[in-house]
Amino acid sequence: MPEPHERRTRICHPITRAFACLCVLFSFASGTMAGEVSIGVAANFTDTTRELIRHFEAETGHQVSASFGSTGKLYAQIRNGAPFDVFMAADVFRPELIEEAQAGVNGTRFTYARGKLVLWSPAPDAFEDAPRYLEQQPFARLAIANPKTAPYGLAAQQVLEHIGQWQPLQPKLVRGDSIAQTFQFVVSRNAQAGFVAASQVKVWDEDAGTLWQVPQAYYQPIDQQAILLNRGASNEAARAWMDFLKSDTAIGIIRSYGYDQGHDAIN
């Protein structure tokens, strides 16, 4: 007859094996349920993205790593191998280039927001008639984003061309690498006014300073598109993020930050 300690050993073996199997299964399930997605996002969408991420992570368990910058610079980084799964641009042009270069997944490109451009000064009563203010130039510096790399900068150039002030204002223009830097120029008073995203002013304090909502007829619509990159093609978290951007929750958040439309109204 076996000794008592031998019986205990034989009884424990099946239990230990079962427990080990459960641990393996739980580990496998956890790995498939939660993943990570890396996204490159246009600078104007920084605050909106951070709120979207909070909701997405709470709903799905997936984790999001976000990098922010000008659309042009993010595009260049992606073409040079930056490890992004999703590209969220502030224009249509660069996502189209990604698609044409077969660096993105066909059929995934869509417009997630339409931006609005404003002329803003943190000083109260800085101007009453914005076009006249720009013509008279009672300021030392006017901030815009770099038109070559930032869609909001290109829109600002279009506005100034529309009112005939692009060339006259050249000596006073200070250009930010991104719309985020442009906004900082104005907030820090390094520029007395600037063309920025309406969403930035809304987050800062939409009742502070002086604001001109630029008529849409003065610049091409700032349709902001996202595309799933090849790196994220088989990433469940990346595809979940793309789906989330089209959800009612995301559209509501996007609109609350001052963007005209979400996915359902544009597509």
Language model features with spans:
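Secreted/extracellular small peptides and ectodomain modules produced from precursors
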Residues: 10, 19-21, 85
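Bacterial N-terminal signal peptides
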Residues: 16-29
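Short N-terminal or domain-adjacent regulatory/targeting segments
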Residues: 13, 25, 124-127
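Sec/Tat signal peptide C-region and signal peptidase I cleavage site
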Residues: 30-34
